[in-house]
């Protein structure tokens, strides 16, 4: 059952060195505040999992938190490369990082399989792709019923999943509004989970606009809930604040240079305090 903690205490308790960590949120609700807390606590040797790593993983990688990244499409959306990811993979700074790249479809299926407690996900995919030649976690199997050749990938079962959402209620249930990625599946697939939210309300069912088909992550599936106002900036939170498009453009120059990046992290993450 969900426990209400500060973000500092939630990360300290559930994100251990060497853990496999998934931070999800597609386009919006990207858990930047939680990612920054992981950096502040100098967590190390993490295996990071995410569909579209985005700036948050560029920052974690450049800060030395990651040893491995499992992902689908790594880039700065609408801008270009993730330069800290590239520097780690190509030149080993701040240290070498192993990568396993999948398709979006495979990653989504892998999270869904993990949430169901299955060992693998099966899909139609990778036809004509060269990814299987560089990722030994992509296999092909024959359907026992039709004989069709299908792709198979391991399910995603993180040690801890971290997501951001708009609201949680006092019972620990979480409401995700707007574009829904694999946040729910990531939480259900994980051994432990942290959910950061913009606010806590008494009862989600009493909130204006609540409807039975809303995406709810149940409190029994969540380990810790932490309030992190504007916790997904510079991405956006539907109904709360817009995306900071200017920062995504600025990040390209910040991340290109090691010294500029290090100075930015020191000023904006290490010395910023965060959502305590």
Residue positions per predicted region:
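Conserved alpha/beta enzyme-core scaffold
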Residues: 1-276
């Amino acid at each position: 059952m969900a426990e209400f903690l500060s973000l500092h205490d939630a990360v300290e308790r559930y994100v251990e060195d060497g853990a496999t960590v998934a931070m999800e949120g597609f386009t919006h609700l990207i858990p930047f505040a939680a990612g920054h807390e992981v950096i502040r606590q100098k967590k190390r040797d993490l295996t990071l999992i995410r569909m579209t790593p985005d700036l948050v993983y560029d920052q974690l990688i450049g800060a030395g938190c990651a040893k491995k990244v499992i992902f689908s499409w790594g880039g700065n959306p609408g801008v270009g490369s993730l330069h800290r990811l590239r520097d780690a993979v190509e030149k080993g700074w701040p240290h070498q990082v192993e990568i396993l790249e999948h398709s979006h479809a495979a990653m989504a299926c892998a999270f869904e399989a993990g949430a169901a407690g299955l060992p693998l996900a099966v899909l139609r995919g990778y036809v004509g792709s060269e990814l299987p030649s560089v990722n030994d976690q992509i296999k092909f199997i024959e359907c026992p019923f039709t004989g069709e050749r299908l792709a198979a990938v391991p399910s995603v079962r993180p040690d801890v999943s971290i997501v951001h959402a708009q609201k949680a209620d006092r019972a620990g249930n979480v409401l995700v509004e707007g574009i829904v990625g694999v946040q729910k599946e990531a939480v259900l697939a994980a051994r432990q989970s942290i959910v950061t939210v913009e606010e806590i309300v008494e009862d989600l069912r009493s909130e204006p606009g609540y409807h039975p088909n809303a995406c709810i992550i149940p409190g029994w599936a969540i380990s810790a809930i932490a309030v992190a106002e504007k916790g997904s900036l510079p991405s956006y939170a539907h109904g709360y604040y817009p995306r900071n498009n200017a920062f995504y453009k600025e990040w390209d120059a910040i991340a290109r240079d090691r010294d500029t990046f290090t100075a930015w992290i020191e000023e904006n993450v290490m010395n910023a305090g965060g959502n305590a």
